[in-house]
Amino acid sequence: MARIAGVNIPNHKHTVIGLTAIYGIGRSRAQKICEATGIPTDKKVKDLTDPDQDALRKEIEKFLVEGDLRRETTMNIKRLMDLGCYRGVRHRKGLPMRGQRTRTNARTRKGPRKAGVALKK
């Protein structure tokens, strides 16, 4: 298994697919990385030579990936919450922040349904 950016890349997969195991690298960015390094996209990870792996590491270092990207994302959300803006308030309450309806739906953000309170008669 090749270890790139602190992540073990699966051996049996093509290089493009294997690179997507790194947080912050999707299919399009993986293809651009392979083009920049001159590595064929259909080459398996186990067939990569040490210079190929070094070239991939050097190219990936140019991007914000893994822990740094996660940290930046959480800091951006924390900044919104500290500002007290609409999006920050919605993050704090655990509700959708992009204008979706919440009377029905929004179960992913709100979590499972709570039991309703019955009125005493």
Swiss-Prot record:
Region (Disordered): 91-121
This protein's record includes keyword rRNA-binding: yes
GO CC annotations, alphabetized: cytosol; small ribosomal subunit
GO biological process entries: translation
UniProt cross-references to SUPFAM superfamilies, sorted A to Z: S13-like H2TH domain (SSF46946)
GO MF term (any one): structural constituent of ribosome
Keywords of the record: Ribonucleoprotein, Ribosomal protein, RNA-binding, rRNA-binding, tRNA-binding
Domain of life of the source: Bacteria
Keyword Ribosomal protein carried by entry: yes
NCBIfam families hit by this protein: uS13_bact (TIGR03631)
UniProt family annotation: Belongs to the universal ribosomal protein uS13 family.
Function: Located at the top of the head of the 30S subunit, it contacts several helices of the 16S rRNA. In the 70S ribosome it contacts the 23S rRNA (bridge B1a) and protein L5 of the 50S subunit (bridge B1b), connecting the 2 subunits; these bridges are implicated in subunit movement. Contacts the tRNAs in the A and P-sites.
Subunit structure: Part of the 30S ribosomal subunit. Forms a loose heterodimer with protein S19. Forms two bridges to the 50S subunit in the 70S ribosome.
Protein name: Small ribosomal subunit protein uS13
Organism: Ralstonia pickettii (strain 12J)
Gene of this entry: rpsM
